[in-house]
Amino acid sequence: MTKGALYRHYKSKRDIFDCIVYRMEQQDGEQAVEYDMPEEEKEKMPEQYENVSLDDLVEYSKSMFEYWTEDDFASSFRKMLTIEQFRSEEMQNLYQQYLVAGPASYVKDLFESIGIANAKDKAAGFYAVMYFYYSMYDGAEDKQNVKDEFVSAIKSLVQELK
């Protein structure tokens, strides 16, 4: 698509960016719905958090790993936020929301609902594995091997939590 064609559809660079963020919000919600996971914070839908099991979280985590690494749109968005987080407070906030504090808080809330002690610390460890493997995947020649290692690591963590 040429720049001219792009600007015929959008008013400005800001409009393009806002549409990208909106699409990410939609896709995030769709992923959660597809795996019967809460779409929003625990305060907004506490009953949905009560219905999640560790096995549900493992399946959802595997799907999110594929989404953030294999989906062209999501992967490009993740990489863009990683680079742009240092250029503005807005990008830093989005980076935190989508890739650091947001997911870690989400996992903590799920762990608390499941009844896991020290939920905050264990959620940080759980999400750290996801984040680490995103980076491993990006630089790997054998991406399937990294994906398999990720699944194994997540399953091991969950076994320790049971």
Where are these predicted regions, by residue range?
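Helix-turn-helix
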Residues: 1-23
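Hydrophobic/aromatic residues within well-ordered alpha-helical segments
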Residues: 13, 20, 24, 28, ...
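Hydrophobic recognition helices of helix-based DNA-binding modules
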Residues: 17-20, 24, 28, 32, ...
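Hydrophobic alpha-helical connector segments
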Residues: 19, 32-71, 122-126
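Amphipathic alpha-helical packing segments from all-alpha helical-bundle domains
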Residues: 55, 69-115, 124
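Short alpha-helical scaffolding segments that buttress acidic/His motifs in well-ordered protein cores
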Residues: 61-64, 78-82, 126-133
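Secondary-structure edge/capping motif, primarily at the C-terminal ends of alpha-helices
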Residues: 68, 85, 137-141
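Hydrophobic/aromatic-rich alpha-helical bundle segments in the mid-to-C-terminal region
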Residues: 93, 97, 101, 110-157
